[in-house]
Amino acid sequence: MAARDLYDAGMTAAGTTDGGAFPSFHLTNGQVDYEGEAVFSHLSLTIQPGEFAAILGENGSGKTTLMKALLGLTPLSSGSSQIVGVDVGRFRDWTRVAYVPQRLLSAGAVPVSVLEVVRSARTRPNRLFMGNADKTAAELALRKVNLWGRRHDRLDALSGGQQRRVMIAHALAKGADIFVLDEPTAGIDHESQRQLADVFSALRDDGATVLLVTHELGVFSRLATRVIVMQGRGARSVAYDGPPPAPAHLADHAWHHSNELAPLPEPSGLLEP
């Protein structure tokens, strides 16, 4: 079941955009300055619906700045940025966009169960009670990420990789079909990385747009359809933009860890709702 179908199991979002008619992200002649210096400039970039794109680069290359500019979290010094055809400053259909940062909020700050976290995606200020359709959407989302069996566990009892999967389930339950992840495998073991890759394999098959920022592709190397390599500041900050793998002279850093892991197995079917 596709992400928007999970959402539509309960309700239809008001004021949503027709994402199929527009690119998921569209940056035109973008520039971001930091302390008087351009992090990148004259950068144009389009991410189409259904793409699985990875922004690679070393620390300081501008990859995280680019991601935040696409989301409107970092203002452009010049140029324009759109999300599904709407200027990022006027975009309001945030149920469609899921941003999973590298550092999650402290899971132990509030004792809350996995199911409560995912169901919170369905709450609305003008409704006192959650309907059966909302509960169904939360269940389907947790099954999609293979965590329905942990639904009654506290969030802080889960591993870092499992917590990221809970955040993805939360996004699915609210109706997201565009996923942006910052270093999704940072600090989690190889098995958790593989499970996370399984989740995104299923999302890709459902037609979701996935944009991830990472030092190396690792377990995502089989899934990526496009690689964008950032290599520094200024007008030539993008060294490569195309299908994987990147040229060898650019890939030493971005890809060398990919070969340390065994090839990712075909999807196991565990993610079927």
Language-model-derived ranges and their functions:
Residues 233-260:
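Conserved beta-strand-loop-alpha-helix hinge in the C-terminal portion
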Residues 214-215:
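H-loop/switch region of ABC-family ATPase nucleotide-binding domains
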Residues 179-182:
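Catalytic Walker B motif of ABC-type/P-loop ATPase nucleotide-binding domains
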Residues 154-158:
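Conserved ABC ATPase signature
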